[in-house]
Amino acid sequence: MRKIIIITLAIIASNFVSAQDGVLANGEEYKAHAEGWMVDINKAYEESKKTGKPIMANFTGSDWCGWCKKLKAEVFDKQEFKTWAEKNVILVELDFPRRFKLPENIKQQNYSLAGFFKVTGYPTIWVFNMSKNEEGKFNIEALGKTGYVKGVKAFTDGVDNMITKAEASKTDGAKK
């Protein structure tokens, strides 16, 4: 039986991004590099809570990581993936660029989450559920992780499998 890890993330939601803080030096709002992706874990949490969908976080080096660019082109940019994602997950891009600066609070958020998930290479994709405790801290239930997988079907089948196993594990645990 697969264990589901439930860990308390000691980052208070209010310390993350607010709308005014996610601004680049040129005054533009910082956004993900693809439509449908969020950059603010708080907004992703709220959307996940509202829809009941897990969060899929893409730890990427958008401007330097060859495998990240390949995954984006071969999977994330395809309509088949976009349709699947809209039905199944909340997408979050956690970027670690080298050629441009992120807003400081986004940078802190991304590094905190990378440290929490022990990300050591890119791309790394984590699928997880989030909740908040009484103190305003996030609890994260990790469902699984993956990296570069060639093709939309192989990628989405892998993520679907993670989600299905986690749900089955919860059901099995509830029966005992």
Stretch-by-stretch model annotation:
Residues 60-76:
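Conserved redox-active cysteine motifs that mediate thiol-disulfide chemistry
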Residues 74, 112-174:
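Non-catalytic, surface beta->alpha helical segment in thiol-disulfide oxidoreductase systems
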